[in-house]
Structures are given as C-alpha cells and as structure tokens.
C-alpha cells in the first residue's frame, strides 16, 4: 500500500513528501540540524524525505530518499533529527563506496553492514550530542552500537524480508 501525499515542501533543497503533520515535524527536525556543522552531510546526501510505513534509506536512487515510519517521525524532533542524520550517513557511505566502483553498485557491506551501521550510529550520536539530546537518548544509541546487526540482513531477498519486519 502506497501512501498518498497530500503535501510537499522543499527545505534547504530537500524535498519532503507526506501529510501535513509529517511535513511540520520534518521541518522542525531539519531546522534543528540546520544550525549544526554536520548539516552539510545531510543536505549533500539526502534529496527526499518521504513519509512511509517503515524507515530506511534508498541511497542508490538518483535522488537518495529517506523513507520514514511514524514511530520515528512522531518521536521527539531531536530524535527524528538524529534519525535523519543517521540515514544520511548511510547515503554518504553508499556514495563514497560507489565512487570507487566505476559505475556499478558497491558491496552492500560498505554502506549497510555492521561496520557501516556502527559508523552511522556514531554520526547519529555526534549529532544528538550537538543537539543536547540528553543522557537517555545518547545511552540508547550507544547500546545499539554494541550490536549493530538489529536491522537484519543486508543482501538478497532476506534483506527485503527483514526490512518488512521493521516497526520503526
């Protein structure tokens, strides 16, 4: 089932697609990120932020797209800002890896494997610290770094099946 977009907006060159509540929360989170030195990574590697049933980034698209599930975007604006940064970093890792692949898709491990997830969580933690997210949120991200395989498989049909199980 595809969500019908009732609204669209462009913030700092990033297209936002979704309902009015989603767009407002996304604007709020992007505004928080805008003041940070790390925002350029977000702006350079995400072209679209789209309301969806579950969260994940499609870094391989011509316009890299962060699909965002309601549990993520309806959480606090600070948490959502951290999630945007996290998935933008996956897109950055994909882009960096693709530069070395002469036009073919890079190995999924380079941008979605456990080592890549640790890098994205570290970037998310950095952003959340810059936003004074609080000890509880920072501790949660640090806990995720201990076992960065929670997102499931990253290759083949199993990857898609694991994505469909996401609640976030």
Could you tell me what each predicted segment is?
Residues 77-79, 94-126:
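Post-HEXXH active-site segment of zinc metalloproteases
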Residues 82-95:
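Active-site recognition of the HExxH zinc-binding catalytic motif
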Residues 34-38, 93-97, 125-133:
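Sec-exported extracytoplasmic/periplasmic mature domains
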Residues 39-46, 101, 132-142:
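Surface-exposed patches in mature extracellular/periplasmic domains of secreted proteins
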């Amino acid at each position: 089932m595809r969500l019908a977009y009732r609204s669209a907006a462009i913030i700092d060159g990033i297209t936002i697609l979704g309902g009015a509540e989603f767009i407002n929360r996304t604007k709020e989170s992007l505004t928080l990120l805008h003041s940070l030195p790390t925002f350029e990574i977000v702006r350079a590697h995400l072209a679209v932020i789209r309301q969806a049933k579950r969260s994940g980034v499609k870094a391989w698209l011509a316009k890299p797209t962060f699909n965002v599930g309601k549990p993520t975007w309806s959480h606090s604006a600070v948490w959502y800002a951290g999630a945007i940064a996290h998935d933008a970093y996956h897109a950055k890792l994909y882009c960096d890896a693709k530069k070395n692949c002469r036009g073919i898709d890079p190995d999924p491990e380079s941008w979605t494997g456990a080592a890549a997830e640790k890098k994205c969580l570290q970037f998310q933690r950095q952003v959340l610290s810059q936003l004074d997210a609080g000890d509880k949120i920072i501790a949660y991200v640090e806990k995720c770094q201990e076992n960065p395989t929670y997102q499931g498989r990253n290759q083949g049909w199993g990857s898609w099946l694991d994505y469909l199980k996401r609640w976030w």
